[in-house]
Amino acid sequence: MSWDQVWIDVNLATMDPSISAPYGAITNAAIAVKDGKIAWLGPRSELPAFDVLSIPVYRGKGGWITPGLIDAHTHLIFAGNRANEFELRLQGASYEEIARSGGGIISTVKACREADEAELFELGRQRLNALAKEGVTTVEIKSGYGLDTETELKILRVARELGKHHHVDVKTTFLGAHAIPPEYKDNSDGYVDLIINKMLPAVIAENLADAVDVFCENIAFNLEQTERVLSAAKAAGLEIKLHAEQLTNMGGSALAARLGAKSVDHIEYLDEAGVKALSESGTCAVLLPGAFYFLRETQIPPIDLLRQYGVPMVLASDFNPGSSPICSTLLMLNMGCTLFRLTPEEALKGLTLNAAKALGIEDNVGSLVVGKQADFCLWDIATPAQLAYSYGVNPCKDVVKNGKLVHQ
């Protein structure tokens, strides 16, 4: 066989649903790569003969290989920090109170408007490096800290540039409807007009976004405004998604499902009718335990209902300066289990196959299947559950991206 590389002495957590074992596991396995794709995988005993003198062979020392991790919800590009708001919350101020007093997202908007692209790129690069060291091979990055045309475009340009200069694949999301900017505080409908008539066309003209998102909440955009933005995005051929039911149940998830959104995110206050709507539309539920933890929330998403209705559950970091300044997907695995009561297998699926579904890229990544992109990680663990079980010592030993060893 003519391959570019072969990995032996490994176990595979393929996350392939066609394999009935937990994690889609194949023990005592091997995996071969050719032209950036998975060319063969299976039990080591069935590995076809190949020229060991001409093909690089990597020995996994009994570790586990998983698909590359996918962080499907981040706000990774921003300037400044909000440590002062952290102190205010510890003193009793709520997220909503801080936002309504001019803090929250708006304080980060000011910092991002003042920062240039070079500064934002370097900050983003450092954060992307941190995720990559934990086995992340694909990340979604949202705008939303500009809230004017110039700065929204600036953030999205930086995100696109990061994708060109880093081995991690970057999917971009336009989130101009993240908050009402100060200059439109008494004219939110006017700001929605700006998003639809000026921002969105400018984003499309430069091909800066793969999807469009809206923060549908009582401190941000109502249902009618949300539908206007999402409908305009859909009409332009972009994928849509939604921040919904984080603080209250406004019916955003049902709206997103009706419009064919790829995902709804947060969903702590999602009810059974909303879960059913997601199930019927095939919309993913993105769980963000970092924000739940950092904001000290008490109502968890309806995990049992999501299981009952077969809604794909995704885990993501929601890395951002205000509600989840936690740049770690491995910690999300642990939090997903300890806070939201996911099983370790559900948690890992939420950072691989289901995360790929939320981004519409499941045909190419998210599981170890012949023909898919060779994005995978070797972990120094005895069982896949260890990834969610402990935190603090990074067990990621090797990362292969597009068939190339990028971290060792």
Swiss-Prot record:
Pfam families: Amidohydro_1 (PF01979). The gene is hutI. Belongs to the metallo-dependent hydrolases superfamily. HutI family. Fe(3+) binds at residues 73, 75, 243, 318. 4-imidazolone-5-propanoate binds at residues 82, 145, 178, 246, 323. Keywords: Cytoplasm, Histidine metabolism, Hydrolase, Iron, Metal-binding, Zinc. Its cofactor is Zn(2+); Fe(3+). It catalyses: 4-imidazolone-5-propanoate + H2O = N-formimidoyl-L-glutamate. Its EC number is 3.5.2.7. It comes from the Bacteria. Pathway: Amino-acid degradation; L-histidine degradation into L-glutamate; N-formimidoyl-L-glutamate from L-histidine: step 3/3. It comes from Shewanella baltica (strain OS185). Its main location: cytoplasm. One of its GO terms (molecular function) is imidazolonepropionase activity. Gene3D superfamilies: Metal-dependent hydrolases (3.20.20.140), Urease, subunit C, domain 1 (2.30.40.10). This is Imidazolonepropionase. The keyword Cell membrane does not apply. It is found in: Cytoplasm. GO terms for biological process: L-histidine catabolic process to glutamate and formamide; L-histidine catabolic process to glutamate and formate. N-formimidoyl-L-glutamate binds at residues 145, 320, 322. InterPro entries: Amidohydro-rel (IPR006680), HutI (IPR005920), Metal-dep_hydrolase_composite (IPR011059), Metal_Hydrolase (IPR032466). Catalyzes the hydrolytic cleavage of the carbon-nitrogen bond in imidazolone-5-propanoate to yield N-formimidoyl-L-glutamate. It is the third step in the universal histidine degradation pathway. GO terms for cellular component: cytoplasm. Binds 1 zinc or iron ion per subunit. Zn(2+) binds at residues 73, 75, 243, 318.
